[in-house]
Amino acid sequence: VTNTDPVTTTIKDNTTPNTETNVEDVKIVLVAVSSATTTIADITNSDGTLKVTNTNETPEGGKLYYIAVAVDKDGKPLATQDGDVTINYGTTPTASGKDATAGVDYDNTTTITTKVGVVFEVETKDDYYAEGDENFTVKITDLKNSPYETPSIDTTKDTVTSTIKDNAPTINGTVVSGGEDTNSNTYGSEDTVYAIITGETTVNEGGVVTYTVKLVDKDGNTVIPTKETTVTVTYTNIGTTSTDDTNKTNNQEIAVKIDASGKGTFTVETKDDYYAEADENYNVKITNVQNTGEFENVKFDSYPNTIPNSPSNNVTTTIVDNVATNNHEVDSDGGVDGTVYGKEDT
C-alpha cells in the first residue's frame, strides 16, 4: 500500500559555519629574473622550491625583469598562477647607495600593475652624466582577483633592489654602436658629449678673430655643464707665420672656460704692418678637456656624422694681407687689410 500523505522536509542551514581547516596558505613573492622569456621552471630548484632572487642590475639604458609568483607553505610554485598585484617604485633604505630618480633614470609609468606568474620589465634610461651606480626598489602590494582561498603577499619577499650601472668618467673613451655602460672603457653615443671649436677661417691683417668652444651631444645640442669646465686650446703658427703676426706665440696653450652659459670664447688679434707678406695661416686646436667627473665621456678626437655642420676640434685661419702697390690712398682712420690701406701698411 502506498502512503499518499504529504511529507514536509526542512533543510537546516548553519548560520555560523565552522571555519574550514587544513587550508594551506598561499604567499605571493617577487623575484628578479634575467630576461623576458624566463619561466617559473627556470627559477625552480631541484627540490621544487622557488629560487628567490631579490637583487638585479643592468647597464644604463638596459632593462630589468621581475615576476610575482604564488607559492605554497613549502615555498613551491603553484601549478596555477593568477591574480593581480600593484607595482610600487621606491628608494633604497640605506644611505650607502645612491638612489635613482623615477622618471629620470628609469621608467616608472609603463608597468604599474602585473599578473601573478607573468614577467614584467622596467626600462632604464641612458644619458651622458657620470652619476655612478644608482639603486631603486620594486615592491608588490594590493593583491586582487586571486583564485586562492587564503592568499597574501609575503612581506619578507615582496621587494627587489635594482641597480643601474654607470660608466666611470673619462676623456676620449671609445664610442661603439650600441655601447652599454660597463666597467670597461667602451661607451655608447648616448654616453658621450663632444668638445667642438668654431671661428672665422679668414681675417684681414689687423683684425681680431673670436673663437667659441662648447660641448654638444650626439645630435649637436648644446650641453651646459654644472661645473666650470676648462678646455685647453693650442695655438700653432703655420708656414712663415711668426709671433710678429698675432698676439699669440707658437704652441701657446690657451685655457678656455665653459661656464653656465654653455660656451667659452677667446680671441686672436692679428698685427698689421707694412710688409706685403702674402696670406699667412695659423691653427687653434682643442688638445685637452678637463675631466670634472660630470660626464661619462668627453670626446674631442672624433665626431659622429649625426652632429650637423661638420664639427671639428680645430680651426685654421688665414690672415689676408694687402697686395703690394704704389701710391695707394691711405685711410687715416686705420684701414684693415683687404682693399683699404692703413698707416701701418704704408
Regions found by a protein language model. Give the residues of each.
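Short boundary segments that mark the start of a structured unit
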Residues: 1-346
